[in-house]
Amino acid sequence: MPPLSESEFLALATRELDRIEAAVEAAADAADADIEISRTGNVMELEFENGSKIIINSQAPMQELWVAARAGGFHFRRDGERWIDTRNGGELYAALSGYVSEQAGASLSFH
């Protein structure tokens, strides 16, 4: 798949962050978990009741979404319609479900 222009990637990343925000809100509501979501540009911060955070941001030069969680730092690259971890091949939403569940202390899943 050919690389996108920077503006194409930023538009794609913004749409994906919108999807992630909606998915986290829906999963948190379903699990009755308190997760504060804030966004500044292409940086999203999820803050949990225990004070821990997950940061998700886009990296246009690398054409990746980066996730920083208690579990570590992860880079996801677009593969068709999915975002895949560049190290272990895991899918973004499956990975986020695990990171968010761990930090929220409740089982949350989203797609």
UniProtKB/Swiss-Prot annotation:
This is Iron-sulfur cluster assembly protein CyaY. It holds the Pfam family Frataxin_Cyay. GO terms for molecular function: ferric iron binding; ferrous iron binding. It comes from Cupriavidus taiwanensis (strain DSM 17343 / BCRC 17206 / CCUG 44338 / CIP 107171 / LMG 19424 / R1) (Ralstonia taiwanensis (strain LMG 19424)). GO terms for cellular component: cytosol. Keywords: Iron, Metal-binding. PROSITE patterns: FRATAXIN_1 (PS01344), FRATAXIN_2 (PS50810). Involved in iron-sulfur (Fe-S) cluster assembly. May act as a regulator of Fe-S biogenesis. InterPro entries: CyaY, Frataxin/CyaY, Frataxin/CyaY_sf, Frataxin_CS. GO terms for biological process: iron-sulfur cluster assembly. Belongs to the frataxin family.
